[in-house]
């Protein structure tokens, strides 16, 4: 397995798919990385030369991925909660942040149901 940005990427998959195993790199970013490195998207990871791997590593190192990106996202959420804006309050209460309805759904964000006794009359 090749190791890029501290992540073992699968050897048997195409490079463009393997790069998406790194947090912060999606398909579009992976395609841009490979275009800049001059590597074909159809190449398998096991067929990459050390030189090509080095180019890819160099490009990925310039991006904010994995731990740095996770840290930045969590700090952004913390900042929203500290300044007390609407989005911060929604994060603090564990409710959907982006305006979704909460009357019926939002179970992922709200957690399992907590039924209240004697609700029906």
From Swiss-Prot:
Q: Which Pfam families match?
A: Ribosomal_S13 (PF00416)
Report the protein name in the record. Answer: Small ribosomal subunit protein uS13
Q: Molecular function (GO) terms listed?
A: rRNA binding; structural constituent of ribosome; tRNA binding
| PANTHER family with a match to the protein in the record | 30S RIBOSOMAL PROTEIN S13/40S RIBOSOMAL PROTEIN S18, SMALL RIBOSOMAL SUBUNIT PROTEIN US13M
Q: Does the keyword Ligase apply?
A: no
PROSITE patterns (UniProt xref): RIBOSOMAL_S13_1, RIBOSOMAL_S13_2
Q: Which Gene3D superfamilies match?
A: 1.10.8.50, 30s ribosomal protein s13, domain 2
| Chain segments carrying region Disordered | 94-121
Q: Which organism is it from?
A: Anoxybacillus flavithermus (strain DSM 21510 / WK1)
Family of this protein:
Belongs to the universal ribosomal protein uS13 family.
**UniProt keyword terms in alphabetical order:** Ribonucleoprotein, Ribosomal protein, RNA-binding, rRNA-binding, tRNA-binding
Tell me, what does this protein do in biology? Located at the top of the head of the 30S subunit, it contacts several helices of the 16S rRNA. In the 70S ribosome it contacts the 23S rRNA (bridge B1a) and protein L5 of the 50S subunit (bridge B1b), connecting the 2 subunits; these bridges are implicated in subunit movement. Contacts the tRNAs in the A and P-sites.
Source domain of life = Bacteria
Q: Where is the composition biased (Basic residues)?
A: 106-121
Q: Which gene encodes it?
A: rpsM
Subunit structure of this chain's protein: Part of the 30S ribosomal subunit. Forms a loose heterodimer with protein S19. Forms two bridges to the 50S subunit in the 70S ribosome.
Q: What processes in GO biological process is this protein linked to?
A: translation
> Which GO cellular component term is one of those annotated?
cytosol
């Amino acid at each position: 397995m090749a190791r890029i940005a501290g992540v073992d990427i699968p050897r048997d998959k195409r490079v463009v798919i393997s790069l998406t195993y790194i947090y912060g790199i999606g398909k579009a970013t992976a395609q841009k990385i490979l275009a800049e490195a001059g590597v074909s998207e159809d190449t398998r990871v096991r067929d990459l030369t050390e030189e090509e791997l080095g180019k890819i590593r160099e490009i990925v190192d310039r991006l904010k991925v994995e731990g740095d990106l996770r840290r930045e996202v969590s700090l952004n959420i913390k900042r929203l909660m500290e300044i007390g804006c609407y989005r911060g309050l929604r994060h603090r209460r564990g409710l959907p942040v982006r305006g979704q309805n909460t009357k019926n759904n939002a179970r992922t964000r709200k957690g399992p149901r907590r039924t209240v006794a004697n609700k029906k009359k």
